[in-house]
Amino acid sequence: QYTVIDDAIDNTLDNGRGGLGTIVVFSAGNGNGAVSYPANSDPRIIVVGAMSPCGERKNPSSCDGESWGSDFGAELDVMAPGVKVPTTDRQGSAGYHSSDYTQTFNGTSSACPHVAGLAGVILDLNPCLGHEQVAEIIAESAQKVGSYTYSFTSGYPYGHWNNEMGYGLIDIDRAMEMTKVLKYQSQGFY
């Protein structure tokens, strides 16, 4: 069903950043099943799943001993670390305190900021890229990790893909290198 949320996503993808399109990144979800709304509402959204520390899709039987699982399926684009991610936690009292940090940020909500940050790095290197180009760089630079079979799949234009892992684990170094090469080529520096 078409909603205000869908309209906002569509508008930002089409018109954000002066017409280049805003990079929209959503968490896949933590139900160990199919990606759900709103992450599955537009194929231009970059959908992020969570990896376990053992290089596999986070699932209830993965090595970390936690009982949740990253959602997966047709809409999944890439994976990022999603178990016990260190981060700040500024919900407590005013000012800095030792409890302002956590070592246990979990779920696809902890994986998603890795990809949003990678998109920011890509745009810092080349702010003229459209949202499709950023998504392509993120997908094509991803590492094929784990014992999964990645294959060319109809409807997945950025290379080898897997139903549980998408295009694989994000790789900031490869993404930065691809962005630099693309920038130099577009400026005529072959």
Give the ranges of each region predicted by the language model.
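Substrate-binding/access-modulating region of protease and related hydrolase catalytic domains
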Residues: 1-44, 92-113, 125-128, 140, ...
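Structural recognition of the beta-strand scaffold that forms the well-ordered cores
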Residues: 22-27, 46-49, 77-80, 86-87, ...
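Hydrophobic aliphatic residues
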Residues: 28, 42, 49-52, 73, ...
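Acidic glycine-/aspartate-rich tracts in secreted/extracellular proteins
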Residues: 31-32, 52-55, 83-84, 123-128, ...
